[in-house]
Amino acid sequence: MQDTIFLKGMRFYGYHGALSAENEIGQIFKVDVTLKVDLAEAGRTDNVIDTVHYGEVFEEVKSIMEGKAVNLLEHLAERIANRINSQYNRVMETKVRITKENPPIPGHYDGVGIEIVRENK
């Protein structure tokens, strides 16, 4: 089964990071979420109750990203994946990618970040 729902390029301002400058100044974080979901029933019925409402998923991600500051992107991603997997039994797998586009690291790059994949058990 290859069906997915994705939320790409969500942007949130937060104060996450291991460096004190990140906690004081803050920065924009880009978040992508991909959910493995069987969409066949929703395709047949045209009813939102047969799928995962991506507006609700956005609000879940927003509450974590704009909430209490943490040190690691890995921790944020785990919280997002755990929240989605616990709230939506239709989701079989959650992939979360978080990017810092302008971290306080010298050099030239488009961004740094992490990506995790967690199965819904």
Swiss-Prot record:
NCBIfam families: folB, folB_dom. InterPro entries: Dihydroneopterin_aldolase, FolB_dom, GTP-CH-I_C/QueF. Keywords: Folate biosynthesis, Isomerase, Lyase. Catalyzes the conversion of 7,8-dihydroneopterin to 6-hydroxymethyl-7,8-dihydropterin. Can also catalyze the epimerization of carbon 2' of dihydroneopterin to dihydromonapterin. It catalyses: 7,8-dihydroneopterin = 6-hydroxymethyl-7,8-dihydropterin + glycolaldehyde; 7,8-dihydroneopterin = 7,8-dihydromonapterin. GO terms for molecular function: dihydroneopterin aldolase activity; isomerase activity. It holds the Pfam family FolB. Homooctamer. Four molecules assemble into a ring, and two rings come together to give a cylinder with a hole of at least 13 a diameter. PANTHER family: DIHYDRONEOPTERIN ALDOLASE 1-RELATED. Its EC number is 4.1.2.25, 5.1.99.8. CDD domains: DHNA_DHNTPE. This is Dihydroneopterin aldolase.
